[in-house]
């Protein structure tokens, strides 16, 4: 038996989903484009705008800490958030700083998923220059805010299927 999210199927399971979006605003214009695509994707799949909270952090390095804090929050002994989308940009400069920030950010976001079993999508651009960044924030390479949000939605579906054993 195969288990895969049907993008054209019944998405009622998303109606009550609560999602946190964390945006690094070091590159505000890029963050805004990623956020817009993420919000459009959530709306397209029926997630109520009132169930979406957007949090802004100074940069990508700060995203994992807030993601961990949000993932740890409970309401009636249940996770407050069903999914988290991390958005931002890290652009390579002239120093090794890029490597450190990228590695720690990616590790931190993935650790949140593993520790709290909450789909936490990595929509943080790691690029060599601004042209590549713009290309991935709605330009010639699409919008990674949309793609990360879709990954989170698909994982929400699969996690629900595994939890309820409704295959």
From Swiss-Prot:
The protein's enzyme class: transferase
Pfam families, per database record: DMRL_synthase
MF terms in GO: 6,7-dimethyl-8-ribityllumazine synthase activity
Keywords for the protein's UniProt record, in alphabetical order: Riboflavin biosynthesis, Transferase
Catalytic center residues: 97
Entry's Gene Ontology BP terms: riboflavin biosynthetic process
Catalysed reaction, written as an equation: (2S)-2-hydroxy-3-oxobutyl phosphate + 5-amino-6-(D-ribitylamino)uracil = 6,7-dimethyl-8-(1-D-ribityl)lumazine + phosphate + 2 H2O + H(+)
Residues that, per the record, bind 5-amino-6-(D-ribitylamino)uracil: 26, 60-62, 89-91, 122
Listed HAMAP family: Lumazine_synth
Protein role: Catalyzes the formation of 6,7-dimethyl-8-ribityllumazine by condensation of 5-amino-6-(D-ribitylamino)uracil with 3,4-dihydroxy-2-butanone 4-phosphate. This is the penultimate step in the biosynthesis of riboflavin.
Subunit organization: Forms an icosahedral capsid composed of 60 subunits, arranged as a dodecamer of pentamers.
Family to which this protein belongs: Belongs to the DMRL synthase family.
Record-given protein name: 6,7-dimethyl-8-ribityllumazine synthase
């Amino acid at each position: 038996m195969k288990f895969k999210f049907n993008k054209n199927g019944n998405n009622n399971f998303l109606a009550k989903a609560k999602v946190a979006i964390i945006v690094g605003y070091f590159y505000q214009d890029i963050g805004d484009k990623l956020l817009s695509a993420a919000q459009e994707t959530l709306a397209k799949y029926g997630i109520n705008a009132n169930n979406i909270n957007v949090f802004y952090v100074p940069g990508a390095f700060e995203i994992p800490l807030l993601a961990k804090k949000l993932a740890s929050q409970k309401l009636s002994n249940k996770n407050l958030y069903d999914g988290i989308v991390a958005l931002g940009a890290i652009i390579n400069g002239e120093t090794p700083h890029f490597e450190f920030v990228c590695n720690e950010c990616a590790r931190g976001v993935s650790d949140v998923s593993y520790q709290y079993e909450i789909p936490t999508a990595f929509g943080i651009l790691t690029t060599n220059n601004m042209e590549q960044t713009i290309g991935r924030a709605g330009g010639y390479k699409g919008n990674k805010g949309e793609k990360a949000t879709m990954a989170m939605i698909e994982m929400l579906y699969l996690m629900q299927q595994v939890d309820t054993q409704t295959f």
